[in-house]
Amino acid sequence: MTKEGKVWGLTEPLLQSPAVEIHRIKVEMGGYCSQHKHQSKINAFYVISGELEIQRWKDYGLCDSTRLFAGDLSIVPAGEMHKFIAHQETEALEIYWAELNHTDIVRENVGGI
């Protein structure tokens, strides 16, 4: 997997599967991503170094803002508009996953001994 340049810095996929993705991101001081949402993916940010602000838009267009430092984690639910801003040069893990339906089993018969 290869690094990809972004306007705000670099992203490097570490793991990509149908159910989960993990990217290492390096964001330049002052760098920010677009305001966006994911239809079905949950998006988490775990800061390794630096300072990353996560903005999340809630009901009535109100914006909640959380500043993350090394060791901090923030989780953005699927469908929620969000954006990140680096207040220092920042390295973080960006983790995506989809909720699994734990009742998605159809049994043809019953197990036994």
PLM segments and residue spans:
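Double-stranded beta-helix
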Residues: 2-5, 83-113
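A short, N-terminal "cap"/entry segment at the start of jelly-roll beta-barrel domains
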Residues: 1-24, 32-35, 66, 70, ...
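Short hydrophobic/aromatic-rich beta-strand segments that constitute the beta-sheet cores
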Residues: 34, 54-56, 94
